[in-house]
């Protein structure tokens, strides 16, 4: 079973059982953000985590096994995204990416922000003009070294 097929089974069962990512996160013992990334095919689950999710979602054994395979990360299509929400992140990086890069370099020096030693938090922020999406990206700074 391919990772894409496993992901589709996860999404179908999640919808059918009317589960939230936070409920699935309880089964993995990780954050809802990490769990969503894992179950959408971007992270590897341990045998215990995959088993717990498999029981919760009634996944077949080959799907549970598939959740434990190291995925090809960043395997989304390379074309400009067409989904409106994902496109806004693409647009955000196009507009603010160079500013973010400059500000990180000014503060930390020449290097990158890790997406491996990384955490993310997504929450709702009440606002009288309409609720806001709050996203915190927290990655370790990794300086380039000279050799």
UniProtKB/Swiss-Prot annotation:
InterPro entries in the cross-refs: Cyanase (IPR008076), Cyanate_lyase_C (IPR003712), Cyanate_lyase_C_sf (IPR036581), CYNS_N (IPR048564), Lambda_DNA-bd_dom_sf (IPR010982)
Active-site residues from the entry: 88, 91, 114
GO molecular function: cyanate hydratase activity; DNA binding
GO biological process: cyanate metabolic process
Lineage: superkingdom: Bacteria
UniProt enzyme class: lyase
Alphabetic keyword roster: Lyase
Keyword Lyase included in the entry's annotation: yes
Catalytic reaction annotation: cyanate + hydrogencarbonate + 3 H(+) = NH4(+) + 2 CO2
Cystines in this chain: none
EC number(s) on file: 4.2.1.104
Gene3D superfamilies assigned: Cyanate lyase, C-terminal domain, lambda repressor-like DNA-binding domains
One Pfam family this sequence matches: CYNS_N
Function per UniProt: Catalyzes the reaction of cyanate with bicarbonate to produce ammonia and carbon dioxide.
Family per similarity comment: Belongs to the cyanase family.
Protein name per UniProt: Cyanate hydratase
Organism: Thiobacillus denitrificans (strain ATCC 25259 / T1)
């Amino acid at each position: 079973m391919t990772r894409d097929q496993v992901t589709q089974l996860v999404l179908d069962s999640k919808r059918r059982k009317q589960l939230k990512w936070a409920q699935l996160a309880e089964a993995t013992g990780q954050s809802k953000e990490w769990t969503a990334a894992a179950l959408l095919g971007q992270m590897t689950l341990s045998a215990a985590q995959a088993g717990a999710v498999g029981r919760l979602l009634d996944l077949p054994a080959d799907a549970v096994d598939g959740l434990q395979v190291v995925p090809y990360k960043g395997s989304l299509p390379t074309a400009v995204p067409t989904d409106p929400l994902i496109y806004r992140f693409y647009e955000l990086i196009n507009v603010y990416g160079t500013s973010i890069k400059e500000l990180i370099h000014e503060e930390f020096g020449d290097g990158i922000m890790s997406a491996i030693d990384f955490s993310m938090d997504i929450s709702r922020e009440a606002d009288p003009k309409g609720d806001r999406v709050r996203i915190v990206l927290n990655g370790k700074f990794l300086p380039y070294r000279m050799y």
